[in-house]
């Protein structure tokens, strides 16, 4: 019986361990998808705010509305971690804010971008993809990029239609989105 249980445990370990390696890092020439507008399925810009596509799920519409609430906020290192509603946001604070507002994160507080490596599931989503690596995290939501910049100018959360390089990032998503 002990041999059987040992063999069973080893088999389970061998089957589940490869799943830990399914998450792959994007290659050097990788970039976010180019923005292409598709009626009903792609968000678009009106000024500095995003307009959700008509066919987007309710949570995606909530996420876009949440992003619009903070696009005017400046970049602030550590912003959005101590308080959900803050005067400035860094990358993980802004991503955490919109995901919580959309009901996609629960009460979990992600204090660093690196912690998003375990959020959701590996791979690209249909409506939402999280790009994450140590030191930075951003989203692509219904075709628009929601991103911050920690440069000296301190650009806080913003929506972008332009692609960006993403070598070294991992991609994550919520199943169904």
Features from the language model and the residues they span:
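Bacterial N-terminal signal peptides
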Residues: 7-16
């Amino acid at each position: 019986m002990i041999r059987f249980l040992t063999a069973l445990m080893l088999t389970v370990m061998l089957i589940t361990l490869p799943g830990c390696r399914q998450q792959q890092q994007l290659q050097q020439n990788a970039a976010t998808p180019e923005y292409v507008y598709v009626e009903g399925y792609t968000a678009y810009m009106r000024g500095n705010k995003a307009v959700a596509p008509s066919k987007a799920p309710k949570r995606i519409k909530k996420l876009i509305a949440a992003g619009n609430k903070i696009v005017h906020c400046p970049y602030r290192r550590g912003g959005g971690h101590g308080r959900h509603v803050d005067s400035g946001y860094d990358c993980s604070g802004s991503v955490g804010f919109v995901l919580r507002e959309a009901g996609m994160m629960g009460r979990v507080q992600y204090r660093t971008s690196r912690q998003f490596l375990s959020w959701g599931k590996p791979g690209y989503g249909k409506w939402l993809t999280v790009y994450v690596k140590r030191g930075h995290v951003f989203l692509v939501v219904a075709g628009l990029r929601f991103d911050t910049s920690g440069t000296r100018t301190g650009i806080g959360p913003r929506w972008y239609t332009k692609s960006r390089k993403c070598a070294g990032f991992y991609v994550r998503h919520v199943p169904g989105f």
